[in-house]
Amino acid sequence: METGTNKTKQKPKYDLWQITAYMLGVAWRGRHWTVFTVGLSLALVTAGRTIAELLFAPAVLRVLEQGMALGRLLAVIGGFSMLLVALTFLQSYLSELNLFGKMNVRVDILDLSARKRAGTSYPNLLDKRFLDLSAKADRAGCTNNESVEAFWVSWGEILTNLFGFGAYLLLLSGLNAWLCLLVCATSVVSYLASRRINEWGYRHREEEAGYVKRLAYVQKVATDRQYGKDIRIFGLREWVEELWESTMRLYHGFLLRRETAYLWANVIDLALLLVRNGAAYAYLIWLTLEQGLPVSQFLLYFGAATGFAQWVSGILEKFAKLHKQCLDISTVREFLEYPEPFRFEDGLPLEKRLDTPYELRLEGVSYRYPGAEKDTIHKLDLTVRPGENLAIVGLNGAGKTTLVKLLCGFLDPTEGRVLLNGQDIRPYNRRDYYKLFAAVFQDFSVLSATVAENVAQCRTGIDEARVWHCLDEAGLTEKVQSLPKQLETQIGREVYEDGVELSGGQTQRLMLARALYKDAPVLVLDEPTAALDPIAENDIYQKYNEMTAGKTSLFISHRLASTRFCDRILYLKDGRVAEEGTHEELLKRGGGYADLFEVQSQYYREENEA
């Protein structure tokens, strides 16, 4: 677990006032004006109700002291009662109304966060800092009680306390000024202690996030059915439990340190409270006994002194709470403003045209993953000619998938350039560049949606005839026709109880149909038949030329026999093109490709003999 000192000294990028301006801007742009109007009205009504409650008893007592008529007494009681009922009703109404504005702002920020994750540059998904900020942004807005929405609650409470502070200050203006200063001074010290604790929590947030992330991962492994068979067959239960318990012990140690700090802050606050209230009460008792202060006035000042201290403490405590929330929202803002290494809307437009030949070229390209000690791809020069069927083969770790990611624009080289028709791809809108490619990747994803939606990758405007054609080319027509709702059958049971589970081979065929439906100029197939049996695999190979007609194709495979139909084969080793040519040429050369092919052929011969 990373808990280095460099993690504990991080400062927030934005302060309280910058975050307040930012949140007001989000609310204004979203036209959620009720957070201003209703929030301010609610603060006034809440403070007004508290002031009315303070004045109620002294007013009644004053009527009795002056010996006024019963009617006057009933009028005072009735007037205050009606006022309190009205203010209570209005407070409840405004509180409910205020929920919608706060929630709408939170939803807007959640939407911005979701769009950031879905549309961010691919390298950011490999960046630990980005992923950590993403997780924290999720936590800051996941419920109504988290910082993104609670921010408005805190500001409402601060305004309420400010209004109350002003009113009570007027009431106490006739008392000793030193008493008011004592109340303010002790409250400020209490606030500073509270703020110090909040800053401790922020400084150690990376440590806490590490424990939470690790616990969440262990919980996922323990409860996800994907791991269920492995846990049972390999007897991993005790190991998973020990991992959970050891991490929980570390997390408990962190919580103990944090709660100890909070305890000392509370002890200081309690001591200051005793000094503050004790001095106020002693002074009022002295005024009553020595100066003849009326009982009604004593009751009023007694309540005002207590309330004044609470208003001051409330202002400072709510600011401390708001400060902590702003630390969380600062993280959200940092996430939303995380720099994008790729150009998107600000890039040059690139139109996908099927009648335009596209040449891809790598010019002196090297790529090294963050934190790696050596290049995965090193000083590689490569030209993919228009309409060429190119195979990329090699052992695990040779750089095949990384090379494809560079060609597809998911990664920018750490050295060199990727060129499209002789032009560097970096100035282009990367999303336009992605439109040139259709792909079946090793780590494919299936949506909890219908068969048609998975193939077309959209919900409206689906060309069903084209979907069926692509399913037929991928060899999945018979399976889909056997499903209860055919194209409208839901895939997976994560969302829909009546969804169907496809086998690994069937899922791979579905992904192939999806790539064919896109009809892009460049088709990328990264181990597209890894989950297929030999007969099904051969069926795909027989249709390969038909599927790639008029397109440039990149075919990545471990099985060298599957590359016979390609125009050219690249044999990668240690991030370089070690050999290049057709299947027959490489076999005649007798190099690494031929050796690997012989090993694989021997395996298949032994299997057939068996």
What positions do the PLM features span?
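Membrane-integrated ABC transporters
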Residues: M1-T50, L70-A75, F130-G166, R214-A216, ...
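Extended non-transmembrane interhelical loops and adjacent amphipathic helices
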Residues: M1-A21, M103-E149, Y211-F254, C326-P339, ...
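C-terminal portion of ABC ATPase nucleotide-binding domains
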Residues: Q486, Q542, A549-G550, R559, ...
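Helix-to-loop junction immediately C-terminal to a conserved catalytic motif
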Residues: C408
